[in-house]
A protein has these predicted regions:
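Short, well-ordered beta-strand micro-motif
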Residues: 14-16, 34, 108-110, 131, ...
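Active-site-adjacent beta-strand/loop module that shapes the phosphate/pyrophosphate-binding cleft
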Residues: 10-19, 93, 97-115
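Nudix hydrolase/Nudix homology domain
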Residues: 97, 114, 122-161
Length: 161
C-alpha cells in the first residue's frame, strides 16, 4: 500500500480492510536486559512523547537491514557505555500490535565492562544499577510503567526459577 505519511524512522499506511484506520510500519527494535553481577543496569530515560522520565532497559531502533544483535550491541554501548562478554537471545515481543508492526528483539547481556555512554544529542539518559531482587519485586508489583522492562525482568525471574 502507498504510505500516507513517511518519516525518517517509520511510515503510515491505511489498514487493509479498514480505510478509517492506519498502521505504523516500523523497522523493528531491540531491548537489552544488562546483567551486572547481582544487579541490572537500567537507564533513567526522559520520554518526550509522554512527558515522563522512566526507569527502563536500554533499547533502540534497527537501522534498515541491520542485524538485531548488532543493534543491541550498539545500543548498549551508546546508552550505558557497557560492553558485554556474553549475549543471549531472549525472544521478541510486539509492543503495540493494535496499530504498529514493530517487532522488538530481546537480549540478555552479561559479563559487563562499564565505560562512558555515547549519548546522542537529544538523549537525556542516566544509567542506574538496580539489585535484581529489588527490580523483580518492583516488576511483580507493577512499578515499571515501561512494558518492555517489566516483561524482560519478569521473564528473567521466571527463568531463574
Amino acid at each position: 500500500m502507498d504510505p500516507v505519511f513517511k518519516s525518517a524512522i517509520f511510515h503510515l499506511e491505511p489498514m487493509p480492510g479498514r480505510p478509517s484506520r492506519h498502521v505504523v510500519r516500523h523497522p523493528g527494535g531491540v531491548a537489552i536486559l544488562p546483567v551486572h553481577g547481582d544487579d541490572f543496569l537500567l537507564i533513567r530515560n526522559h520520554r518526550r512523547a509522554i512527558g515522563h522520565t522512566l526507569l527502563e532497559v536500554p533499547a533502540g531502533t534497527l537501522e534498515p537491514g541491520e542485524d538485531p544483535k548488532h543493534a543491541a550491541v550498539r545500543e548498549l554501548a551508546e546508552e550505558t557505555g557497557a560492553v558485554a562478554a556474553s549475549w543471549s537471545s531472549f525472544g521478541h515481543l510486539w509492543p503495540a500490535p493494535g496499530f504498529c508492526d514493530e517487532r522488538l528483539h530481546l537480549f540478555i547481556a552479561e559479563g559487563l565492562t562499564l565505560g562512558a555512554p555515547q549519548l546522542e544529542e537529544h538523549e537525556e539518559i542516566e544509567r542506574v544499577l538496580v539489585p535484581q531482587a529489588e527490580a523483580i519485586q518492583s516488576a511483580a508489583a507493577g512499578a515499571y510503567a515501561d512494558a518492555k522492562t517489566a516483561v524482560m525482568i519478569l521473564r528473567f525471574a521466571s527463568r531463574k526459577g
